[in-house]
Amino acid sequence: MDKKLNEAVAALRPQMVAALQRLVRRRSVEADPLPGKPFGEEVDACFAEALTLCHELGFETTDMDRYIGWCEIGTGDEMVAVLGHLDVVPEGEGWHHPPYAAEIEGGRLYGRGSIDDKGPVVASLFALKAIRDLGIPLNRRVRLLFGLNEETNDRDVLYYKAHGGEIPVLGFTPDGEYPLINGEKGILNESYAVQLHQTGAWQLDRVQGGVAGNVVPDYACAALTAPAGASLPDAEHITVTAIPGGYQVEAVGVSAHGSHPEQGENAIGRLVCYLDQLPLEGDAKQAVHFLAEKLGTDPYGERLLGHRLEDALSGPMSCNWGLIEGDAQHLWVKLNYRYPVTMERADCQPAVQTAFEAAGWALDGQVHKEKLYYPAETPLVSALLEVYRDATGDNAPPKCIGGGTYAKMLPNVVAFGPLFAGDPVTEHQPDECIDLERLVQNAQIIANAIVKLANLPLE
């Protein structure tokens, strides 16, 4: 580690914190497109704030039609990329700190996006500033990309590639874990829909739950028509309230990142398993029973596949039931499932679709992100591991994860930081936060990694 570079980064801490507060205070959840704002007003406003920060720090920026932008330092024919993103998942419920106030308490800055991924973006920006201000020689250009659609469909990077965006020779995204992520499971986001025709005394009138496909839902509710005098059973985690003509049923769970649904408690699954006990009739009964039997609260998709799909490198397939919507005429669900790095889409997707179609459901949408795997001996992986080990003294091996990052979207890129072993995992959850000491430490590691990759000989 370069002592002078580390000291220069540490001296920038007050500016880093202030910059991060500015970005966190900009809610940046994707919304319907507007003219010149493909991801909606809020995402565009946060992007504008990031570009303003760059200009205030003396960087020139490039804006690719408001889909993605970047700042850059250095010269040379080749480019090293650092890919971060400014968009966030919806805030959801259960916060003790306002999700967009960027409050600091106990050495931590709280807010949606603070760790995923605005904090790492700010750390990367000030790493570039320290390198530039010290005049450290670089044999390659270094480009910090500001992504705007990572949490949903990666349309930012897809647009970048489709419109001639330069491909890096080396790069990383600070949107994962240390020491380094050299494998990412394949990801399938799928939605399914079914029509309902209800005529009985018990009817499902409305159902809703979840905030995003890649978040374990902590709340779900349904409204039912019920015969006069009918009563509903008590159940743990379920609240029943009488309403005109029937009942409202609410279920609570525990939120978690959709790549680790086993770490949460799925409120949608709890709700549907409860509804499955009620005397619904016809299509509604069949649809609810299918969901309870084949999905329920199973975080591994074993019920859908009939077996557990797993490997030694990355563990079992995960299956997060992230969203449900419906009324008296239809139901719609969205799944986010992730298959192991040594396996293929064909090992799981056809079986999932067949199970739904056999029960009368139709595939309503699908987005697939391929798996990723780089052996530990590749130059990119070994160089970044060297930087991390020099900074921390930790010789832990690289790891495979269920999370999906920008590393899947561009070649020669892996996820590197920002989470250290033992750090609280708060992304996509209430009270998301970043430790400010970790913010500075990340900026120091990123700065040294940039210098390493920009000067790394390649055959």
Residue ranges and their predicted role:
Residues E151, L158-P340:
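Midchain, well-structured core segments that form catalytic/ion-binding scaffolds
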Residues Q21, L51, V122-K129, L158, ...:
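Predominant activation on well-ordered alpha-helical scaffold segments within soluble catalytic domains
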Residues P90-E105, Y192-Q198, T241-A251, E357, ...:
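Acidic-glycine-rich active-site phosphate/pyrophosphate-binding loop
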Residues D2-R112, L134-L138:
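Acidic/His- and Gly-rich active-site-bordering loop/insert found
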Residues L86-V88, V142-N153, P174-P179, V211, ...:
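Acidic, glycine-rich active-site loops and adjacent beta-strand->loop/helix elements
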Residues M79-F146, T152, G164-V169, Q429-E437, ...:
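Active-site metal-coordination/substrate-binding segment of hydrolases
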Residues T62, P261-A328, R338-P350, W361-E459:
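An extended, acidic, His-containing surface patch that forms the Zn2+-binding/catalytic region
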